[in-house]
Amino acid sequence: MGALSIRAAGPNDDETLFAIHRESAMAAYVEIFPPDRYRFPDAEMREVWALALRDGKTSVLIAERAGSPVGFATVSPGWLRNLFVVPTEWGRGAGAALHDEAVVLLGSGDASIAQLWVLEENERARRFYETRGWRDDGGRSRSGFPPHPVELRYALRLGEGRRAPPGRTHPEPPPTQGDELRG
């Protein structure tokens, strides 16, 4: 399996982000956005990831196992914007490692509370975040993508989330460790 490492994304990682996002979203959201009715927005997402790498406000972390990208997280001041992991890595610690590093980044800013949006129907992601100290704060929105499912806003008081020890290399998790996908 090999050790997992986390690195900062570079300016040319937009296609890597797109590929991970597409693969993980197609697996995680199959019941929410059935692909026979709702096509994945390829062109729009390619542009989103290209802009995220250039905007100067977004930090992007990429998880790699044996040199291959397996997941990523995006953070902007006070917000965990995205956390996606390829399905073959679900339950293997990549999501937990990305989350922990993202929380460290969030804690290094001025915010005392971090927030994220998660799809209400994505129970797996909700459990993942709740296990790590995130709580539904009552905020509600609708996804910008048809069929416009409900999104829940979760909050984490920084300093209370589960974090990895300092460092950016993570050993293999025990077989029972949970790992989820951002909603």
Locate predicted features.
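Conserved N-terminal entry element of GNAT/NAT acetyltransferase domains
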Residues: M1-E15, L158-T176, E180-G183
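Conserved GNAT-fold acetyl-CoA-binding loop/helix
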Residues: R22-V48
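A short helix-loop-beta-strand connector motif used in the catalytic cores of GNAT acetyltransferases and
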Residues: R46-I62, W79
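Conserved beta-strand in the GNAT
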Residues: I62, S68-W79, F84
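A short, internal acetyl-CoA/4′-phosphopantetheine-binding micro-motif in the GNAT/acyltransferase core
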Residues: E64, L83-G91, V118-L119
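Conserved acetyl-CoA pyrophosphate-binding loop and the N-cap/start of the following alpha-helix
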Residues: E89, G93-E101
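Conserved GNAT acetyl-CoA-binding A-motif
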Residues: L106-W117
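Conserved beta-strand-loop-alpha-helix junction that forms the acyl-donor binding cleft
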Residues: L116-R126, S143-H148
